[in-house]
């Protein structure tokens, strides 16, 4: 199975399976001389790791990242990138492959089981292999490296919808995101989501969600017209996350409901002699090129396919079966997708940052 790499100058390859001994990433193209500590990477993995609340999978993984290459250790305990490939590894320590024995020959409705088997003639039924959300741990580690490439850029994500329950944007407070198990920026939605997900869990079911990622401090001029648009690459990386079914930038599909006067971001010259935008409906990107305004992306995540509810399906022999999935699964995988979305946006921006620096010499 190919297509495990993405990026041009900042290039990432992820490897490993949900129930293998380990998984990880190789980051190629990171500039030399960037100083960081292991904690600078671990903080992002700690946001994504399972078992932190009753609303996510109870699989227990410490998700401790190891840096195997591409750095020089320093006397103060930090590391400096050398410019060679950075290899990152995260060990799997809490697999229960026996939970999947009953579905070894059965296809879970809504899952990649059928299409993987159809295309390759083999699939890793133990947790889904590469189609598992577990694969995203490697992306988050790579995203930690990508952030090192982006001076002055802040990338933050939040959960804005679970099922039909949306946040009130008037209550948006970034300081609240790390104070609840949902990464919710609206503290008033937290008890609503708690009650709702408790019901979903008791039913043995799952539900979808929407994540919003905002990147601030992105320099104007990243991206290129037509086939190298910044929003094109951000969208592609967000769509590559397992379970993502839709992505929008700025107003996104909402732009189809308003007029040109309402949608256009008008401009004026600021007191400092620099142009300013009076709104940001475009989500920080025009013509595939960043404007300097915050980049805003949202993505929709489908409900987890592995649920306890009995459903109709077929097996690998073409027989009709009724299937119920055992094991430990996220009732709402969108919760842990927040740091994954941040990582994907970071990787896209790092790649375009280096491409712009190489092509125009504007950025240092």
From Swiss-Prot:
Keyword DNA repair part of the UniProt annotation: no
Gene Ontology, cellular component aspect: cytosol
Keywords: Amino-acid biosynthesis, Aromatic amino acid biosynthesis, FAD, Flavoprotein, FMN, Lyase, NADP
CDD domains: Chorismate_synthase
Catalytic activity: 5-O-(1-carboxyvinyl)-3-phosphoshikimate = chorismate + phosphate
Pfam families tied to this protein: Chorismate_synt (PF01264)
CC cofactor: FMNH2
One term of GO molecular function: chorismate synthase activity
GO biological process terms on file: amino acid biosynthetic process; aromatic amino acid family biosynthetic process; chorismate biosynthetic process
Cofactor details (free text): Reduced FMN (FMNH(2)).
Subunit structure of this chain's protein: Homotetramer.
Function noted in UniProt: This reaction introduces a second double bond into the aromatic ring system.
Name recorded for this polypeptide: Chorismate synthase
Lineage: Bacteria, Pseudomonadati, Pseudomonadota, Alphaproteobacteria, Hyphomicrobiales
